[in-house]
Amino acid sequence: MTETVSRPHATEGAALYIQDVTLRDGMHAMRHRISPEKVAAIAGALDTAGVDAIEVTHGDGLAGHSLTYGPGSNTDWEWIEAAADVVHRAKLTTLLLPGVGTVRELEHAYKLGVTSVRVATHCTEADVSAQHIGTARELGMDVSGFLMMSHLAEPSHLAAQAKLMESYGAHCVYVTDSGGRLTMGSVRDRVRAYRDVLDAGTQIGIHAHQNLSLSVANTVVAVEEGVTRVDASLAGHGAGAGNCPIEPFIAVADLHGWKHNCDLFGLQDAADDIVRPLQDRPVQVDRETLTLGYAGVYSSFLRHAEAAAKQYGLDTRAILLAVGERGLVGGQEDLIPDIALDLQQNLRR
């Protein structure tokens, strides 16, 4: 068992590292369509409000623009450049999925001012991250491992994958609840499993989704268990029912006396004045997004399932339940229309 006594802990005075994902995970909520000017407005407001890092890219990471994931209104580079022009204090961050983005894209993002990257894999496929984590370290970047759909791996197995990412050079590894399926006990078990195997100097992060209305609660539990890096977004802007909303989480952090650098009112203003008006579909818990969490479905599948439901005259929930039963993971969005067609044919029999 790895010694954990010296691990920094928010309950003992360690400062939280608040990573905003409005301009990455939030891209799913806008179908990856936002002008560079709006990116700059959001990034500038976040920088002024004191977040530690701002993640910018297509919702599926660098080079995620495709028919499978959804084309963006602009390139990653246009969005990153817009943010880089106005971010003066926070770390400009991006996301990379090996097999979607390449080392070449990572190097170009670094040249544009990105100094931190999260390398994301499915929760059982950490081994594919070695090259990208290694390259990020060679560039001198802050680098985290991002184990998506963490609910699909038992705590000990997930921790073993986290240990692999640590061995490749990750400064931090996240419990990433992409489906918004984890409950408080499930989060607690996974963070404790990480603590058991990771070096005390390796940070632990939490990325929560709101599909079961547990994102703030899950994040609080994670911090209580030793997490210091927290993902959140303005107005919860993100895939499915959204991410952990940054404003209420910071309010709760204040009530607990946890250290952070954020201005609560500044975050509230940015959420209500800039982000909410951009939403063409409310980012909230409703019958469709709740089904994502209930069935343990990748949150970014929401818009794809809604489109298929409209095309084939189906209930989106039926599609999402079928997706969950088949165990689809990120990158298999193109199978959703096939599932919808099967459901339609079954109804006609």
UniProtKB/Swiss-Prot annotation:
EC number: 4.1.3.39
Active-site feature positions: H28
Keyword Glycoprotein assigned: no
The keyword Metal-binding belongs to this UniProt entry's keyword annotation: yes
Site (Transition state stabilizer): R24
Gene Ontology BP terms: catabolic process; L-leucine biosynthetic process
Disulphide-bonded residues: none
Any Pfam family the entry gives: HMGL-like
Record field: catalytic activity: (S)-4-hydroxy-2-oxopentanoate = acetaldehyde + pyruvate
GO molecular function, one term: 2-isopropylmalate synthase activity
Domain Pyruvate carboxyltransferase: residue ranges: 16-268
Keywords: Aromatic hydrocarbons catabolism, Lyase, Manganese, Metal-binding, Plasmid
Binding residue positions for substrate: R24, D25, S178, H207, Y298
InterPro entries from the UniProt entry: 2-IPM_HCS-like, 4OH_2_O-val_aldolase, Aldolase_TIM, DmpG_comm, DRE_TIM_HOA, PYR_CT
Ligand binding (Mn(2+)): D25, H207, H209
NCBIfam families in the cross-refs: 4OH_2_O_val_ald, PRK08195.1
HAMAP family per UniProt: HOA
Similarity remark: Belongs to the 4-hydroxy-2-oxovalerate aldolase family.
Name of the protein: 4-hydroxy-2-oxovalerate aldolase 2
Organism field: Mycobacterium sp. (strain KMS)
